[in-house]
Amino acid sequence: MARTKQTARKSTGGKGPRKELATKAARKTRRPYRGGVKRAHRFRPGTVALREIRKYQKSTDLLIRKLPFQRLVREIAQDFKVDLRFQSHAVLALQEAAEAYLVGLFEDTNLCAIHAKRVTIMSKDIQLARRIRGERA
């Protein structure tokens, strides 16, 4: 076959179509068949969180388990006096007050995070909320 002279072609400015690598092309064509296994349903990010927020805002029950809270109260009370006894109503009153305080603190913390144009609360938001409340100088 005789050699022929090739003439220069004018460039179109863009990149031409590339050839795929053999391994990449093989990977695309030969996908393993799952055999009809259905994936578990997943909600979009944030949907479950919003559902939980609505659920907990509706409820009035205590969110911290009673026995772990009671152990914590007894452990803290040990530092002041040994062999202190607590009525069950006293522990429940302490738990109600502690949960009310924490809920209020988290509400203020969330406002601090929103003010900083964030949706995620951070420790600095808690510190700011406590400082504004006058609990910590």
From Swiss-Prot:
Residue numbers carrying Phosphoserine: 11
One GO term of the biological process aspect: pollen sperm cell differentiation
Basic residues: bias regions: 25-36
Gene3D superfamilies (alphabetical): Histone, subunit A
Single GO MF descriptor: structural constituent of chromatin
Modified residues (N6-methyllysine): 5, 10, 19, 24, 28, 38
Gene Ontology terms: cellular component: generative cell nucleus; nucleosome; nucleus
Region listing for Disordered, in residue ranges: 1-36
Expression sites by tissue: Pollen specific.
SMART domains to which the protein is assigned, alphabetical: H3
Residue numbers of Phosphothreonine PTMs: 12
Reported phenotype of the disruption mutant: No visible phenotype. The high redundancy of histones H3 might compensate for this mutation.
Sites bearing N6,N6,N6-trimethyllysine, chain numbering: 5, 10, 28, 38
Keywords: Acetylation, Chromosome, DNA-binding, Methylation, Nucleosome core, Nucleus, Phosphoprotein
Residue list for modification N6,N6-dimethyllysine: 5, 10, 28, 38
Residue(s) carrying N6-acetyllysine: 10, 15, 19, 24
Family indicated by similarity: Belongs to the histone H3 family.
Function comment: Core component of nucleosome. Nucleosomes wrap and compact DNA into chromatin, limiting DNA accessibility to the cellular machineries which require DNA as a template. Histones thereby play a central role in transcription regulation, DNA repair, DNA replication and chromosomal stability. DNA accessibility is regulated via a complex set of post-translational modifications of histones, also called histone code, and nucleosome remodeling.
Subunit organization: The nucleosome is a histone octamer containing two molecules each of H2A, H2B, H3 and H4 assembled in one H3-H4 heterotetramer and two H2A-H2B heterodimers. The octamer wraps approximately 147 bp of DNA.
Descriptive protein name: Histone H3-like 2
Gene: MGH3
